């Protein structure tokens, strides 16, 4: 089964209660839908959004089994195997050996950590917004390994490489995606 966004959101809330995790899921969902449209997958935008929404389904309850436990949960809920594979693949090289294959999986892999880093940069700005955020501001913070240390630069760079994009292109496109995502508002 491929759930609607509302059904996916309900499943997400069964396993996640922390506002930070819920906001992150909504941001990644919006970013995924944006990239679906930008990359010519308009007809799959809702599917990409569902994958983004559910990608960290197990993280709050089972952080040590991240991308492993969610496969069990999703299969038990009857979710389509494409969702199971896509969400698990964002843990490639970290917790699972499921490699991102489809463009959608590569986008998720590349942008998951990056949205966190961009969000952290935005929160440091007086505007607390991605609307006036520039590539150079993100790159400056990106170079500081202590800034948003939980956001793996290695994963971000590997994701850009998987997509055949430069790091600058990935960051710039993700900033644009976050500007188009209502959940990526930090100034409210």
Feature locations, PLM:
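C-terminal binding/interaction regions
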Residues: 137, 143-172, 176, 185-188
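Charged/polar positions on well-ordered alpha helices
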Residues: 27-34, 38, 72, 76, ...
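Divalent metal-dependent catalytic cores for phosphoryl transfer on phosphate-bearing substrates
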Residues: 41-147
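Electropositive phosphate-/nucleotide-binding environments in soluble metabolic enzymes
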Residues: 2-6, 22-26, 64, 101, ...
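Acidic/His-rich, divalent-metal-binding segments that scaffold phosphate/diphosphate chemistry
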Residues: 1-62
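Internal active-site segments that recognize and position negatively charged phosphoryl groups
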Residues: 182
